[in-house]
């Protein structure tokens, strides 16, 4: 446990950001999994789930969770699955 006041604050903010990032990342992965499942079953709502997953990926990029090229690659793969 840190003794310096600023270090104590950094630990607290790191925990807050870590939990926020974890929930954001989890939501992104969940959206991708839902789309994958819908695309595999040729569900009617696959297009809507694709849009939702794309939004989650873009949001993760803007928050610094993933690299923009990673998001672009994932979106490209999702679009290819949607087209099939």
Swiss-Prot record:
GO cellular component: cytosol; small ribosomal subunit
UniProt-annotated stretches for the region Disordered: 1-28
A GO biological process held by the record: translation
The keyword Repeat appears for this protein: no
Annotated signal sequence range: none
Record's keyword terms, sorted: Ribonucleoprotein, Ribosomal protein, RNA-binding, rRNA-binding
Pfam families per UniProt: Ribosomal_S20p (PF01649)
Keyword Ubl conjugation listed: no
Record GO terms (molecular function): small ribosomal subunit rRNA binding; structural constituent of ribosome
InterPro entries: Ribosomal_bS20, Ribosomal_bS20_sf
Top-rank taxon, per record: Bacteria
UniProt similarity note: Belongs to the bacterial ribosomal protein bS20 family.
UniProt cross-references to PANTHER family, sorted A to Z: 30S RIBOSOMAL PROTEIN S20 (PTHR33398), SMALL RIBOSOMAL SUBUNIT PROTEIN BS20C (PTHR33398:SF1)
Summary of the function given for this chain in its UniProt record: Binds directly to 16S ribosomal RNA.
Protein name in the entry: Small ribosomal subunit protein bS20
Organism whose genome encodes this protein: Listeria monocytogenes serovar 1/2a (strain ATCC BAA-679 / EGD-e)
